């Protein structure tokens, strides 16, 4: 699968993603590990306020979040989706987790992709599995 099927955009933020080619390769590796391929995956980096409004409009939730994932897939095993990530939340969460912004962002990038492969994070057990999958995904990075 061509790696140009993963796109990065920004809304209401000046954030510039570095190492795009390496990140695309890594995300494709995660998908392949889960026996999925990526047809089209859009990551949209945005502000807290932008994502809060989306959370209100689309999910009827009135709180800040770091990520919202929309699954547009029509065929099992073929990923199509839009993932909105609040750079403000990522930066704050990195501090809270005593992590770097880069590592926290990569965790969130993987988290959204893992949702599109079927992993959930509502229950304690699901959260534990998601965290383990995020950790495994981070260990696949070669950059």
Curated annotation (Swiss-Prot):
Q: Which GO terms describe its biological process?
A: rRNA processing
Tell me its cofactors.
Zn(2+)
EC number(s) on record? 3.1.-.-
InterPro entries reported for this sequence: MetalPrtase_cat_dom_sf_prd, YbeY
Q: Which Pfam families match?
A: YbeY
Binding note for cofactor = Binds 1 zinc ion.
Q: Does the keyword Nucleotide-binding apply?
A: no
Q: List, alphabetically, the GO terms of the cellular component aspect.
A: cytoplasm
Principal place of residence: cytoplasm
Compartments in which it is found: Cytoplasm
Tagged with keyword Zinc: yes
- What keywords would UniProt list here? Cytoplasm, Endonuclease, Hydrolase, Metal-binding, Nuclease, Ribosome biogenesis, rRNA processing, Zinc
Summarize where Zn(2+) binds, as residue positions: 111, 115, 121
Q: Which GO terms describe its molecular function?
A: metalloendopeptidase activity; RNA endonuclease activity; zinc ion binding
Domain of life the protein comes from: Bacteria
Role according to the record: Single strand-specific metallo-endoribonuclease involved in late-stage 70S ribosome quality control and in maturation of the 3' terminus of the 16S rRNA.
The family classification in the record reads: Belongs to the endoribonuclease YbeY family.
What name does this protein carry? Endoribonuclease YbeY
Q: Which organism is it from?
A: Cytophaga hutchinsonii (strain ATCC 33406 / DSM 1761 / CIP 103989 / NBRC 15051 / NCIMB 9469 / D465)
Instruction: Supply the source organism's classification.
Output: Bacteria, Pseudomonadati, Bacteroidota, Cytophagia, Cytophagales
- Tell me the gene name: ybeY
């Amino acid at each position: 699968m061509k790696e140009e099927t993963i796109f990065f955009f920004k809304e209401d933020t000046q954030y510039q993603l570095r190492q795009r080619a390496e990140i695309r390769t890594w995300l494709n590796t995660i998908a392949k590990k889960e026996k999925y391929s990526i047809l089209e995956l859009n990551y949209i980096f945005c502000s807290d306020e932008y994502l809060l409004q989306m959370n209100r409009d689309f999910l009827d939730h009135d709180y800040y979040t770091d990520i919202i994932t929309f699954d547009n897939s029509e065929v099992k095993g073929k990923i199509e989706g839009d993932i909105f990530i609040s750079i403000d939340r990522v930066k704050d969460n990195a501090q809270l987790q005593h992590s770097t912004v880069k590592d926290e962002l990569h965790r969130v990038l993987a988290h959204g992709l893992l949702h599109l492969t079927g992993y959930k994070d509502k229950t304690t057990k699901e959260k534990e599995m998601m965290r383990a999958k995020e950790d495994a995904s981070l260990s696949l990075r070669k950059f």
